């Protein structure tokens, strides 16, 4: 029962869409109604409100981090195996993609995935963050940066953590992230993908 409660709690935490929450609090339009239609920091940035985008980014990353850290602490307290931590990581990520509180219209998961990876292993998170930043600085395209990072994240996980359940979890998260970017892939191929910071 405790396993189910932790997984459900992680999913509900992941379902907090900070793009929508922050936008409402700051009197901005719903990020699902303009730009890419994605409730994420990049789309919030298209309003020109950098503070809102930063708060969205931090909130989405923090919930992924908290889900893993809290699950790890409770697992130790109740003598649960480490698999529950990985299940909670996946549950939080899926919650972000399909949030029950917002009609299952979630984001693409980049910030939440980063928070999860940092919690699983700081070096893994740092490697992925460095990859995203490097790609963003060179190409100025958020989706391309995310896709390249998603492809490399399981490789980083295997090298840093070993080819184990943790690496498999990272692979699943990466595959889900790529799936959520399927529309962006077409835009990248046709040269229609928007650049970071472009106003809607």
Curated annotation (Swiss-Prot):
Residues annotated as transmembrane:
2-22, 51-71, 84-104, 113-133, 143-163
According to the UniProt entry, what is the EC number of this protein? 2.3.1.275
List the catalytic activities from the record.
an acyl phosphate + sn-glycerol 3-phosphate = a 1-acyl-sn-glycero-3-phosphate + phosphate
Name residues in a coiled coil.
Answer: none
Which InterPro entries does the record cross-reference, listed alphabetically?
Answer: G3P_acylTferase_PlsY
Q: Which UniProt keywords apply?
A: Cell inner membrane, Cell membrane, Lipid biosynthesis, Lipid metabolism, Membrane, Phospholipid biosynthesis, Phospholipid metabolism, Transferase, Transmembrane, Transmembrane helix
What biological-process GO terms show up in the record? Answer: phospholipid biosynthetic process
Q: Name one Pfam family in it.
A: G3P_acyltransf
Task: Give the subcellular location.
Answer: Cell inner membrane
GO MF, one annotated term:
acyl-phosphate glycerol-3-phosphate acyltransferase activity
Q: Tell me which GO cellular component terms the UniProt record holds.
A: plasma membrane
How does the record say this protein sits in the membrane? Multi-pass membrane protein
* Pathway membership, UniProt: Lipid metabolism; phospholipid metabolism
User: Which protein family is it in?
Assistant: Belongs to the PlsY family.
Q: What does the function comment of this entry state?
A: Catalyzes the transfer of an acyl group from acyl-phosphate (acyl-PO(4)) to glycerol-3-phosphate (G3P) to form lysophosphatidic acid (LPA). This enzyme utilizes acyl-phosphate as fatty acyl donor, but not acyl-CoA or acyl-ACP.
**HAMAP family, per the entry:** PlsY (MF_01043)
- Quaternary state and interactors: Probably interacts with PlsX.
What is the name of the protein in this document? Answer: Glycerol-3-phosphate acyltransferase
Taxonomic classification: Bacteria, Pseudomonadati, Pseudomonadota, Betaproteobacteria, Nitrosomonadales
């Amino acid at each position: 029962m405790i396993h189910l409660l932790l997984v459900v709690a992680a999913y509900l935490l992941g379902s907090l869409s900070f793009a929508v929450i922050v936008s409402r609090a700051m009197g901005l339009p719903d990020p699902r109604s303009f730009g890419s239609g994605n409730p994420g920091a990049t789309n919030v940035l298209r309003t020109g409100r950098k503070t809102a985008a930063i708060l969205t980014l931090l909130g989405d990353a923090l919930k992924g981090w908290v889900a893993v850290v809290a699950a790890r602490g409770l697992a130790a307290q109740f003598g649960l195996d480490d698999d529950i931590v990985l299940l909670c990581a996946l549950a939080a990520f899926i919650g972000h993609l399909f949030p029950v509180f917002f009609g299952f219209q979630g984001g693409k998961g980049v910030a939440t995935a980063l928070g999860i990876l940092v919690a699983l292993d700081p070096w893994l998170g740092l490697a992925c963050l460095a990859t995203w930043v490097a790609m963003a600085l060179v190409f100025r395209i958020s989706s391309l940066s995310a896709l390249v990072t998603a492809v490399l994240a399981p490789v980083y996980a295997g090298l840093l953590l070993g080819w184990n359940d943790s690496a498999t979890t990272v692979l699943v998260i990466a595959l889900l992230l790529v799936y959520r970017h399927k529309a962006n892939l077409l835009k990248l191929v046709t040269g229609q993908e928007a650049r970071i910071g472009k106003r809607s």
